[in-house]
């Protein structure tokens, strides 16, 4: 299946042990572009992420919109339309979706946006420095993940290219980036900042 498929399985296992992708939740998609080829590898629905194998992945031709590989007995991720929207509207190279408890908790404390500034880790985000304010939009959860598409499209249309994530209230977070390496960095940095914000709230420290 290739390097992208192996990497998705490796990362899903790592994310499982971080409690980001437990109980079959969450998913990852990686895009591979080579000449005229434009292909996405997508983690399936309902598979324990720590046990996932490369042959479990769906492979889609992004130019034609057709599946090149459909694993037997598995269902496509309900996140697929959301992954595709990030590829189309942000020219992303990868998308990570987790059920991070830090994201869920922050979604209960903040209204329409999560904001934080004057924290060193913000430098990990694109075009952000120590004094800049990181803003992550928060959208409302729906019964099915594919029903989030309209809200996600609104975020992708209204927010700047420097916005690389959206929190889904009571659900988790989607993070995208130009490559899986960058996407992973953004995801880790954001989760750090979300956790820090929760601790600051616990100790009544105002967010800068």
Curated annotation (Swiss-Prot):
What does the record say about how the cofactor binds? Binds 1 zinc ion per subunit.
* GO biological process terms held by the UniProt record: L-methionine salvage from methylthioadenosine
The residues that the entry says bind Zn(2+) are 97, 99, 171
Reactions catalysed according to its record: 5-(methylsulfanyl)-D-ribulose 1-phosphate = 5-methylsulfanyl-2,3-dioxopentyl phosphate + H2O
Q: Where is the active site?
A: 120
Q: What is its EC number?
A: 4.2.1.109
Q: Which cofactor does it need?
A: Zn(2+)
Q: Which GO terms describe its cellular component?
A: cytoplasm
Q: Chief localization class?
A: cytoplasm
> Which terms are listed as keywords in the entry?
Amino-acid biosynthesis, Cytoplasm, Lyase, Metal-binding, Methionine biosynthesis, Zinc
Location of this chain's protein in the cell: Cytoplasm
One function term, GO molecular function aspect? methylthioribulose 1-phosphate dehydratase activity
Xref: PANTHER family:
METHYLTHIORIBULOSE-1-PHOSPHATE DEHYDRATASE
Outline what the protein does: Catalyzes the dehydration of methylthioribulose-1-phosphate (MTRu-1-P) into 2,3-diketo-5-methylthiopentyl-1-phosphate (DK-MTP-1-P).
The entry's family comment says:
Belongs to the aldolase class II family. MtnB subfamily.
HAMAP family on file: Salvage_MtnB_euk
**Protein name per UniProt:** Methylthioribulose-1-phosphate dehydratase
Name of the encoding gene? MDE1
């Amino acid at each position: 299946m290739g390097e992208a498929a192996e990497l998705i399985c490796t990362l899903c296992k790592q994310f499982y042990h971080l409690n980001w992708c437990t109980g079959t939740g969450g998913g990852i998609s990686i895009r591979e572009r080579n000449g005229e080829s434009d292909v996405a590898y997508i983690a399936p629905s309902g598979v324990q992420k720590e046990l996932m194998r490369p042959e479990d992945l769906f492979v889609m031709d992004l130019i034609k919109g057709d599946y090149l590989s459909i694993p037997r007995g598995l269902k496509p991720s309900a996140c697929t339309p959301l992954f595709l929207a990030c590829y189309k509207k942000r020219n992303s190279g990868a998308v990570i979706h987790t059920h991070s408890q830090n994201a869920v908790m922050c979604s209960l404390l903040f209204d329409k946006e999560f904001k934080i500034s004057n924290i060193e880790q913000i430098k990990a985000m694109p075009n952000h420095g120590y004094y800049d304010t990181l803003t992550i939009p928060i959208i409302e959860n729906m019964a099915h993940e594919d029903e989030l598409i309209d809200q996600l499209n609104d975020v992708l249309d209204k927010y700047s290219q420097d916005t690389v994530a959206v929190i889904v209230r009571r659900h988790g977070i989607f993070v995208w980036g130009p490559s899986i390496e960058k996407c992973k960095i953004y995801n880790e940095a954001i989760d750090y900042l979300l956790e820090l914000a929760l601790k600051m709230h616990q100790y009544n420290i105002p967010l800068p």
